Amino acid sequence: MFEEFYEMYEPEEQEVVALINRCIGGGYNWKGNFWEMTVVTLGVVFCDTAKVSTKEERLEWPVTDEERNSEKGWERFQNEQICRLKIRQMKEEWAKDLVAWPWCISQVVKAHEDCPELQAVLDEYHKPVVIQDQVLGELTLDKDHDVFEGEIQWRGKDVLLSLEVNAESKPSWTRARSAAKKLLADCETWDKAMRELVAKNLTELANNWLSQDEENPRDPGTDPITEEELARRISLTSLSVTSGGSFTAWFDCDEMFTDHAVTVYGSLKKGLKTANIEG
């Protein structure tokens, strides 16, 4: 039943030893009525050349709906597993518009393989990466999620900072840090603008929520939440910045939207985009 899936890949097989990073799930193939599962690698040794590649590869295989949550699907590979596989690369006609050309797994030759070269890759992966930035402070790289995490002072208050980067591309680290510094350098202006946008977009909704809160004695009909009050009561808790200069700011809403958070989206180039409640 998986003929349509395997037809997207070249017939030639390559034998490899792969270091699995993690399974990232799969998309549903509506035409073939099956799931396409995907794991990404930390490293691959191509057996014909003995070449070690640390470029992330995507390895895919098809499963039925019943198999998806079994040892044939999500449980087929474990994080940091080293295994010997036979794989086939996707045909150009299917992969030409993709950022990276995936491979399909045609056979698991050996589920667990000893490979000193890939063990060295794994050992290097486990080494912590910490940057000491004079403005942003200590930033620690979460390699699994391609993000640096730290804490900054935003208008005198502690705010969690996340920098979304490509863990394998140090220039992206520099760009994300630069974007965060630009936001921080003009934090008074950005903070005021974000609060004004939230107040403009969400004050009416805040009063609707208040009217439905039976435990709150305040009557929005006679004592409504004003835009000024809403802008004052929210507080920035975390900020996420990409290497391209886009950012997302999360605000605590002082229970005006129960346990939901207020999020503001924007970019350095285009300014603020929108404000929503989420969570």
What are the roles of these predicted feature ranges?
Residues 161-226, 230-233:
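Long, charge-rich alpha-helical interaction segments
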Residues 86-122:
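OB-fold/S1-family single-stranded nucleic acid-binding modules
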